[in-house]
């Protein structure tokens, strides 16, 4: 059961590859909206769990974009030091 709860911390489902690419800011905005909705006391358990999974996917994708940006920055810094 606990493994299922943290399953969303892994890579998003394969069908996400077909989805249009979002920017880091768009992922963060989607995550903020999900958090706002999760605070709704009238949200059902099922809807809350679905929303949680979606939010975790948005977080994962935003983190990946941030990680890639950092790696690109590091690469540029290394190139600048050689020049």
From Swiss-Prot:
It comes from the Bacteria. SUPFAM superfamilies: XseB-like. Pfam families: Exonuc_VII_S. GO terms for biological process: DNA catabolic process. Residues 1-25 are annotated as: Disordered. GO terms for molecular function: exodeoxyribonuclease VII activity. Its main location: cytoplasm. One of its GO terms (cellular component) is cytoplasm. It catalyses: Exonucleolytic cleavage in either 5'- to 3'- or 3'- to 5'-direction to yield nucleoside 5'-phosphates. It is found in: Cytoplasm. Its EC number is 3.1.11.6. Keywords: Cytoplasm, Exonuclease, Hydrolase, Nuclease. Bidirectionally degrades single-stranded DNA into large acid-insoluble oligonucleotides, which are then degraded further into small acid-soluble oligonucleotides. NCBIfam families: PRK14065.1 (NF010668), xseB (TIGR01280). Heterooligomer composed of large and small subunits. Belongs to the XseB family. This is Exodeoxyribonuclease 7 small subunit. It comes from Helicobacter pylori (strain P12).
